[in-house]
Structures are given as structure tokens and as C-alpha cells.
Amino acid sequence: MTNSKLTETLTFECETGNYHTFCPISCVAWLYQKIEDSFFLVIGTKTCGYFLQNALGVMIFAEPRYAMAELEEADISAQLNDYKELKRLCLQIKQDRNPSVIVWIGTCTTEIIKMDLEGMAPRLEAEIQTPIVVARANGLDYAFTQGEDTVLAAMVQRCPSNAPEQNQIEKKSLVLFGSLPTNVATQLNLELERCGIQVAGWLPSQRYADLPVLNQNVYVCGINPFLSRTATTLMRRRKCKLISAPFPIGPDGTRAWLEKICSVFNVAPINLIERERLIWDSLEDYIALLRGKSVFFMGDNLLEISLARFLVRCGMIVYEIGIPYLDKRFQSAELQLLEKTCSEMNVAMPRIVEKPDNYNQIQRIRELQPDLAITGMAHANPLEARGINTKWSVEFTFAQIHGFTNARDILELVTRPLRRNKALENLGWNQLVKM
């Protein structure tokens, strides 16, 4: 293994570490809220049910639009008929909720016992007259955010190839893919409208009936780094053209994202440089806290490279970017922007470690003593006990971090542990955090 010092070029390493991360079935938490007329049925064991209840904070009276189909010993030993059981559950769901689409989420157990969900779904769909989408968002993936990637890739197959009114199809139309809160998606739509580009649709759409038209005339662009499987499906199955752009995280990433889309559509971007400068000026109070500080990404949700690039632009030094999985083709534009940002800020390039070994990472953190470690929840308390400031990476997944106006939310999350410890020191309580 190379030493932990910084280098002048991006270096890529691959270790064989443990995947201390959430299960991908957690994607249900935000997708059922995004697709308003959907119902998610997770097919798994008691463990999956406990995870959904505890990790997602299910409220008894809220009646969320997802449920657990719990596999028992009789299911696993093939004593029960899977088709009949799933039919009974889906009929009950249709009667109680009447969703426009039912999404079956396969888990590790359905994978291990070779449950033929893809074979049963079309038969049952024809019988109950409700679309059934199958997504194997199991724990065999690299990161929990890839659960959304699996669901969206399955949704691609259900998108129409042609609009009802053919004459309204433009020669080139734009579809954005990735799940965002409605207000953030509206912000990005408005940014593109200011540049003279109309967004034809989003994947996923708020309603199943509003899924976008996908064909060879459609340009698609992702808004999250963990959607490589969806991008591949869009290109191979629906012949869409992928716009390879940095992701709209931070003012710099949002500007680069908009500029790349504008260049593809032969449109001159309007006042983007000035708009980015105004946003940076408004963030100066946070940036002053971060300038010259160091950060270490342990790797958890595949947002690491985009966040690291933004924090470098804020004046931070990034020692290492741990990432559970890196698709260099899908993130090529982001990697180029990271390299360019480090060069412009005159800081050493961080090394990127794919599938990091957590034990080795702890040793490197002990050597480097970063001001902040962005880590999964499993390592946060042990690092805090050793005097390292930490931030849970899962918070960035659920926070609104896309677009110009939400850059402040990213910095609010990043600076919170630094501000907290400074406040404790001012009170004379610094002995509590330095063991």
C-alpha cells in the first residue's frame, strides 16, 4: 500500500473492505413519497421488516404507502405457493389503496432462494389489472443509494416510446433522471427554463401515468452519481443519448451541469457566471469556517466525489475520498471537474479509494488527523471518542443538496460539528471531546 501523503494527480486504489452501509431497500423511504400513486411491497424476512421500521421511523398512524411481505419457513422450503400468496397481498393492496403501480422490492432472501419475481409479475399484472414493477434492490449492491438506481432502471422499461400526439414531439427533448423533492426539481426546471431549455419530463415522475417518453430523440441527464445502471438501461434499451455532465451539487457543479446541457442543445447560457458568483458571496460566512480545514471521506453513499469537489472549491483540503463503488464512465465529467478544481485552488489531488478497508482507513485517519471525517453511522461514535469530528454521510442523502440555492444546506451540515465543538471549547468543555 502507498503511504497516506497527498499527490499531485488523481490516484485510484481499490481495497477489499467491508461494506458498512445501509441496505438498498431503504430507497423505499424517499421513492414512495416521490411517486405519489405508488405502493411498494418489500418481499423479505423479519430482518428487512425490522430495518424498515427502525431505520425509516415508520409512524403507526401515517399509513405509509409501503408494506412488508414477510417470508416464513414454509415459503423458503417451497411448501407454500409464492404466486398465490403474492396475489392475495396485491389484491388486498388494490382494494385498500388502489395504487396506479405496485413495486415489488426483492431482497437478499428472494435472491438466495431464486424466487422468480420477474416471471410471476406479468401473470399477476394481467390478472389484477394493475402494473407491477420488479426491482431487486437487495443488500448485494455496493451502496444503499443504488436501490433507487435499480428501481429507476426497472421503471425505464415502462416508459412510453411515443407521445400520444406525434406532432408535438420535438426533435431533441430533455429528460432528467433521479429522485428529488418536488421543490428542488422545480428549481432545476426553472434554471433550465432561464437558459431557454424546456424539461420534457422526469424519471421518476410524481404520477406513474406521467412517465416520460423515451426514444432515440431524447437526451437524458442524471442528477445523482449513483444512477449508472439507469443510465446504461436508458442508452441500451431505449436508445436515449446520455449527457455526461458533472452533477448539480454546489454552485460550481450546478453551473457546469447547466453549461453542459446548454452546449448539447446549442443554447447560450444566460448570466450563469454572475449567478454562481452571487451564490458564493452569500456562502462566505460558512466558507470562512472551512477554509484551510481538512476532510476525510470514508465512503458510504456514492456522493463522495461530488461533495469533495465542492468542499475543495470552498477551500478545504481533501485527504482521501473513500467510495463503495466507482463507475468511471458515468462519473467521468465529475472526475475531470474535481481535477480542474484542485488545480485552480492549488491544492494536492486527493486519492480515491474504491471499496475501502475500514481498518486501514482508521489507521490513515489516525496518521492524518483530519479536522472532519464524513463517515457512515457505524464509525461515527468510535471516531468521536478518539477526538475526530464526524458527520454522518447518510444525512447528505436525505438533505436537499442540489442546485444553486441548496448549497447553503450542504455547508450547514458540514460545519455543524465544527461549530458545535467550538461552542463547547468556548464554554471550557473541551476535555469532554478530547480523550
UniProtKB/Swiss-Prot annotation:
ATP-binding found in the keyword field: yes
Pfam families per the UniProt record, alphabetical: Oxidored_nitro (PF00148)
Pathway named in the protein's UniProt entry: Porphyrin-containing compound metabolism; chlorophyll biosynthesis (light-independent)
Catalytic activity: chlorophyllide a + oxidized 2[4Fe-4S]-[ferredoxin] + 2 ADP + 2 phosphate = protochlorophyllide a + reduced 2[4Fe-4S]-[ferredoxin] + 2 ATP + 2 H2O
Gene Ontology biological process terms in this record: light-independent chlorophyll biosynthetic process; photosynthesis, dark reaction
HAMAP family: ChlN_BchN
Homology family: Belongs to the BchN/ChlN family.
Name the UniProt record assigns to this protein: Light-independent protochlorophyllide reductase subunit N
Biological source species: Auxenochlorella protothecoides
